Amino acid sequence: MTEIAKIPPRPKYHDPVVVERAVERLVKPVQEWIDLRAQFQPKDLKSQLTDCIHNNGYEYAKELEERYGWEPDSALVECLDRLDIQSAHQHVVRAWVTLYSVKIPFNIGDRVCTPTLRAGTVKDFDRSTAQLAVQSDENRDEGKDYRTLIDFEDAIPILGTIGEAAPAEGGAA
């Protein structure tokens, strides 16, 4: 079983290492945009892109204009729209799983809940990101095979379902 106390928390979308990873993929196309316009040469392109990060290319460009005097156009907005924080986050989480040898302490068939999922059954895993694919009881009852990805550390085992039968309530067992 994973010893949670020794493993630092799972990286979040807003963590500096995730933002840095996402911005690194923008530096080259934005630098090419700057080179074509020769309007200016920012002293620290990467830090300006990091300071103004936004998931909407237009808003991102607007922030660069307001804070650093950039003169954005549609080509820059298109470059900035390529920001992929989700991909960067997955990359950082995979590295976290590998670095700390994170193991999922659940089995397929285990019953779990979370603050946002009343109850469900573990149907599969994504070991690379230490996540459970859980089918909620509601989806099961409706005949839907939808699964929700849940970070393993957010899953709470439903008592009596991991390795042993639930005790009988209110009567003889």
Q: Which residue stretches match the model-derived regions?
A:
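Mixed-charge, Lys/Arg-rich low-complexity intrinsically disordered regions
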Residues: 69-108
